[in-house]
C-alpha cells in the first residue's frame, strides 16, 4: 500500500479486508500518520513501513528490505530513486541487494511487471482506492493489482 495522503478510511477498509489472510502489510509512504493510526486500530497487524517525500519530519527509513518466505523484498517510496523518470535506478538497487521483489509508490500509477529477473510492483495510490498484493506459493511469486 502507498500514498494514502489522508484517505484513512480507504486505508482502514483495505486492512480490514485482508487482516485475517495477509501475513504482513508494507506501507510505502506518503501517509505515515494515516498508517501510524492504523497500527493503533489494528495492533495485531504485522507491518513494515518507509517514509515518502510528503512525510515531512519522518524518522522512518527511505528504504528497507526484508526476507519473507525465502524471498528478499526491497521497498521504498521511490523518490530517492527518481521513479517518476524510470525504474532503472530502483531496479539496480534491488539487484545490488539480491532482491527477488521490488516495491515502490510515489507515482500513484498502479502496475506490476517482471524486469531483469525482479518482480516489480507499484500498488498505486490508496487515496484512489488502489493497492497490491503479493502471494508466494511454492516459491512462485504472484503479483495482484487490486482496487476497492
Please tell me what each predicted stretch does.
Residues 36-48, 93-101:
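Short, basic/low-complexity N-terminal boundary segments at the transition from targeting/disordered tails
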